[in-house]
């Protein structure tokens, strides 16, 4: 079996702790044949992070691409990708990022609704889940129609936080 992982974040993303080099070595140790780094690039900037929380640093696109590209001669196959979040909230920026480099793989993600915080930060007690999820799937559909990525990721992203907060939700 050929083992791959195409959704990996490094220290270029604020939600990860390992360098690209460390992740290549760990992947090789785990007998993974091929990986693709897809660090976060949020097209809506820090607008989805509430005041009082640490804002994400500006993504260093050139530095990121150079660092990952330098690993192409690793003991395993290494691809250069990116996770574009909230593409439809800033299509001109998304287009600029997509045109910047010959990406091997692009994830399209939706971590927050337009003019809302990332679901990670939202308190959902007392919130009616049906309209929230309807809005989410409508915006996810808009992202799917945009169709400038390899894979649409996190299809049920809000559900993770709904359950984490002890709420139940039936998608049917």
Regions found by a protein language model. Give the residues of each.
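Short aromatic-enriched loop/helix-cap "lid" or pocket-rim segments at secondary-structure transitions
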Residues: 48-49, 93-94, 119-120
């Amino acid at each position: 079996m050929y083992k791959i992982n195409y959704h990996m974040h490094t220290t270029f993303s604020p939600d990860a702790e390992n360098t690209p080099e460390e992740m290549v070595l760990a992947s090789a140790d785990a007998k993974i044949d091929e990986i693709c780094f897809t660090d976060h690039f949020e097209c809506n900037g820090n607008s989805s992070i509430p005041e009082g929380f640490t804002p994400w640093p500006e993504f260093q696109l050139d530095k990121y691409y150079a660092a990952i590209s330098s690993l192409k001669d690793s003991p395993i196959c290494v691809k250069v990708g990116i996770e574009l979040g909230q593409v439809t909230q800033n299509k001109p920026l998304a287009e600029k990022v997509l045109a910047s480099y010959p990406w091997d793989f692009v994830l399209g993600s939706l971590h927050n609704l337009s003019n809302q915080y990332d679901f990670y930060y939202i308190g959902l007690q007392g919130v009616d889940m049906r309209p929230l999820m309807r809005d989410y799937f409508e915006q996810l559909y808009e992202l799917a129609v945009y169709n400038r990525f390899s894979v649409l990721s996190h299809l049920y992203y809000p559900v993770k936080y709904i359950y984490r907060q002890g709420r139940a939700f039936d998608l049917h």
